[in-house]
Amino acid sequence: MLNIEKARTVSAGLPSAIRLKVARTPEELEDVYRLRYQVHVIEDGKFGEQSFPDGRIVDAFDDMSYVANIVAYEGSEAVGTLRINLDSGQGLPPEEHYNFGDFRHGVTESWNRNHDTPARIGSASMLAVQRSWRHRRDVIRAMFKLGAGIGHSWDGSHIIAAVNAKTAGMYERIGFESLDSEQWIEGIGDHVVPMACKFSAFHSWAFGDLIDSLKTLDFFSYRFQRVILAADKVVFRQGDDHGEAYIVDIGAIRISKGGESGEELTLATLGHGQLFGELSLIDTQPRSAQATTLTTTELIALDREDFFSELEAQPHRIRDMLKIFPSVCAAPMNWPLCWRMVPPSSVLSIR
């Protein structure tokens, strides 16, 4: 049963919406680099004598083949960021501060004995959250959840980090373990703790039973965004034309529709693990109902552009993707919509 009243009280004073995504545009990446500088240098006074004349912190690891800079926005303002990397031969950011050689050797030997594919080690680094937002654990958790999905989509086996000693407890709560005592890093001007975790454990913490119940969404991990909303906020209105589908991770959603006499009719109340708005991914028609948060709510979001990009990239998985829409594609009136999803090269494979 949804405990709506208890959760509703938590939302008092929250901003209307916080959106978390992977920074992809030049403008979003600029927001990431400037936020790092604002947090680490201006707010926290770290990085000692290092000079950042342009007010940005950016390094070679931002140009790696496997890099994802996650950014959290309140409106147009970036309030938090986290970087995820996967090693492709040039090392990882935490190895600038600690020798993870023994850990690498041990997990690589163990992994390779028990798996057909080699160990793939990634990292979490450059966590930066505005001081006024550091009490918002839900925002920080949501950044790490996005990171877990990204690492999973890259087939990562393990993740390492050299974390601020003050935040080590937070990392432990999401599955990381300390590899050594805290170390003083002169270049940063602070103590760090080397930590590591299996990506499978990290992913399990982030998604729990969601992927078990919605297995066909697994291959969209890199495309997901997350949206955090206070109670009584509209996700979308009847008649809107924005193409985005959602899964409820935390909280509750009311689906409603305007009646003939002007009253609002409740069609459904949705909770953890339930999918809604999925027809908008394949149909450009306006929304047929309204979705409103009943409590503080965290949603996993997938937009139409990302959905079709993944469809084109993995045409061999079209049959699995169609399983996301069992009720939609079962209705004859929607068959033309579902058929438009199928690339010509996949027609034979789904007959």
Question: Which ranges hold each PLM region?
Answer:
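A glycine-centered beta-loop-beta connector
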Residues: 73-77, 251, 262, 303
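Conserved beta-strand in the GNAT
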Residues: 69-71, 76-86, 123, 280
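Short amphipathic alpha-helix that is part of the acyltransferase structural core
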Residues: 7-58, 67-73, 78-79, 213-216, ...
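Cyclic nucleotide-binding regulatory module and flanking cytosolic helices
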Residues: 28, 194-234, 281, 313-326, ...
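Regulatory nucleotide-sensing modules
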Residues: 209-266, 271-276, 287, 350
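Acyl-donor binding region in acyl/amide transferases
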Residues: 90, 94-178, 182, 188-191
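Cyclic-nucleotide recognition modules
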Residues: 108-109, 268-326, 330
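A short helix-loop-beta-strand connector motif used in the catalytic cores of GNAT acetyltransferases and
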Residues: 60-71, 91-93, 243
